[in-house]
């Protein structure tokens, strides 16, 4: 555990909350100080469900610590009386774990009728993804019992969960494809599953676990312990979906079920046309221009691999770079992206990713909410393809990422993300003639930076641009010969900004980056029109 400005994953008890909030008649109780109940607000804001989050905070206060008392037994009794759950999962937050209290004994003193599970989610060893995956796997191991196989072929779907990225939409897409194949769903878990449903998991003929982050270990356990074969691929894209369907039919055939392949039109929404428009749309003039637009992809393991392959294999876009923050899946990502990128960026520090994006200046960034902020800073196109996300990525409408429907959704996102903004380019070229737009407020000229001595005693803040200047040059004349002893992050003068606006928007970011690089190499603290012209002359742009 570490303090961070932004984090790609939530804390361990956040992951526990995702599992409890996904399941029916399961409730999480957090042994935590008042400040750690922010998790409840996150679920209430983002999850878009009519129910209150299935979690309660048993508050630990300074008074309790001074008196040597603990409120947990009373809280557990109140939860049982109010909610009547089948299972209560008790977990300490990242703050109270430091107290090293024995929550097992405290839970026993509550004298509950329902089952209680004290889960050791140590934030010094795990974060959201590992905590959620480990808890779900433990629940499957605890409750899954040997069952006779269902009469007709059925499948389990493991992985969709509360606050999952488009998880409910993916579930609809998977159900549609399975129904087209004539297959029934045995259990979906953790989303909507009860403890009784977990007991029925071994009755299925096959387990589908499309996400590397959640459901993978449980699917492997069911295969090893009960002989239920597992399909662990994610059908992201048209060709991967076709291969996924074929693999599903092969596994069921090995289990003794013959699943005939219906015509492809049966998978479409109208039942008459092709299941996806991507194959022909990728060959149109609209998409032909995308073949030269480099993309950078970053996020969780599942979506990074799926989207990277989709962009290059089906849309013809070159991949400038790819990476993931899920470190325990890094080797799998490297294996899957062999031949797509020379190196996979593995980091959970958003500033490292931001620096890579700034260096590459791709035409399209596919990432998380953090990459959206970074792209806005550098005026780059960005689409969100992975958690963490904000409210706009928890949609009410049907927007899956898996299956044929998901391929169309991703292609639409790529197309609209890269082409919207053309009106901005036209306004840059022709002004607002005929548009009746209000006059744009003139930018306030950038003031000359005050001289700052670069000393060890006065370091610059890590997340703020550092300006180290011996003496601020005039904004109207080209700076003198560089003094590269101190690295600078140059400031743009008003005349240079005005000149930069004349550059077409789709290459403006790259020009800005090249000019700033030129200025840094020569020690220019302020980029004036003269500096910009000098950079243009030297770079030949």
UniProtKB/Swiss-Prot annotation:
GO terms for molecular function: 4 iron, 4 sulfur cluster binding; ATP binding; metal ion binding; oxidoreductase activity, acting on iron-sulfur proteins as donors; oxidoreductase activity, acting on the CH-CH group of donors, iron-sulfur protein as acceptor. The keyword ATP-binding applies. [4Fe-4S] cluster binds at residue 36. Keywords: 4Fe-4S, ATP-binding, Bacteriochlorophyll biosynthesis, Chlorophyll biosynthesis, Iron, Iron-sulfur, Metal-binding, Nucleotide-binding, Oxidoreductase, Photosynthesis. Belongs to the ChlB/BchB/BchZ family. Protochlorophyllide reductase is composed of three subunits; BchL, BchN and BchB. Forms a heterotetramer of two BchB and two BchN subunits. HAMAP family: ChlB_BchB (MF_00353). This is Light-independent protochlorophyllide reductase subunit B. It comes from Chloroflexus aurantiacus (strain ATCC 29366 / DSM 635 / J-10-fl). The lineage of its organism: Bacteria, Bacillati, Chloroflexota, Chloroflexia, Chloroflexales.
């Amino acid at each position: 555990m570490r303090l961070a400005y932004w984090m790609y994953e939530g804390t361990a008890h956040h992951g526990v909350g995702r599992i409890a909030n996904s399941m029916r008649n399961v409730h999480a109780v957090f042994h935590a100080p008042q400040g750690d109940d922010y998790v409840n607000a996150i679920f209430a804001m983002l999850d878009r469900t009519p129910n209150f989050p299935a979690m309660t905070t048993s508050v630990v206060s300074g008074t309790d610590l001074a008196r040597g008392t603990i409120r947990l037994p009373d809280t557990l009794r109140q939860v049982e009386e109010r909610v009547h759950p089948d299972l209560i999962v008790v977990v300490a937050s990242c703050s109270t774990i430091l107290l090293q209290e024995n929550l097992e004994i405290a839970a026993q003193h509550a004298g509950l009728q329902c089952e209680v599970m004290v889960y050791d989610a140590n934030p010094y060893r795990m974060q959201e993804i590992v905590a959620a995956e480990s808890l779900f796997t433990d629940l499957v191991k605890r409750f899954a019992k040997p069952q006779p196989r269902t009469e007709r072929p059925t499948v389990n779907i493991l992985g969709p969960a509360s606050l999952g990225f488009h998880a409910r939409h993916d579930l609809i897409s998977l159900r549609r494809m399975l129904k087209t194949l004539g297959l029934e769903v045995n259990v979906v878990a953790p989303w909507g599953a009860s403890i009784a449903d977990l007991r029925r998991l071994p009755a299925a003929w096959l387990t589908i676990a499309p996400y590397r982050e959640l459901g993978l270990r449980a699917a492997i356990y069911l295969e090893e312990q009960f002989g239920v074969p597992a399909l662990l691929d994610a059908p992201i894209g048209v060709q991967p979906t076709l291969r996924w369907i074929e693999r599903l039919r092969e596994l069921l055939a090995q289990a003794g079920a013959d699943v005939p392949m219906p015509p492809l039109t049966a998978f479409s929404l109208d039942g008459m046309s092709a299941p996806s428009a991507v194959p022909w749309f990728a060959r149109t003039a609209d998409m032909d221009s995308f073949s030269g637009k480099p993309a950078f992809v970053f996020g969780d393991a599942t979506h990074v691999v799926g989207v990277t392959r989709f962009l290059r294999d089906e849309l013809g876009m070159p991949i400038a770079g790819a990476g993931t923050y899920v470190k325990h899946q890094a080797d799998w990502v490297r294996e899957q992206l062999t031949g797509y990128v020379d190196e996979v960026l593995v980091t959970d520090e958003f500033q490292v990713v931001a620096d890579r994006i700034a260096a590459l200046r791709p035409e399209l960034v596919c990432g998380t909410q953090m990459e959206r902020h970074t792209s806005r800073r550098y005026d780059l196109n960005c689409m969100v393809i992975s958690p963490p996300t904000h409210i706009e990525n928890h949609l009410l409408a049907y927007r899956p990422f898996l299956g044929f429907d998901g391929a169309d959704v991703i292609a639409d996102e790529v197309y609209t993300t890269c082409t919207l903004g053309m009106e901005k380019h036209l306004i840059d070229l022709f002004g607002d003639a005929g548009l009746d737009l209000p006059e744009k407020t003139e930018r306030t000229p950038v003031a000359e930076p005050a001289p700052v001595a670069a000393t060890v005693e006065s370091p610059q803040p890590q997340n703020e641009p550092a300006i180290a200047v011996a003496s601020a040059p005039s904004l109207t004349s080209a700076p003198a010969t560089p003094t590269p002893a101190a690295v600078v992050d140059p400031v743009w003068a008003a005349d240079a900004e005005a000149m930069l606006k004349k550059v077409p928007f789709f290459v403006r970011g790259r020009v800005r980056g090249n000019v700033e690089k030129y200025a840094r190499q020569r020690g220019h603290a302020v980029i004036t029109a003269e500096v910009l012209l000098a950079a243009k002359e030297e770079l030949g742009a």
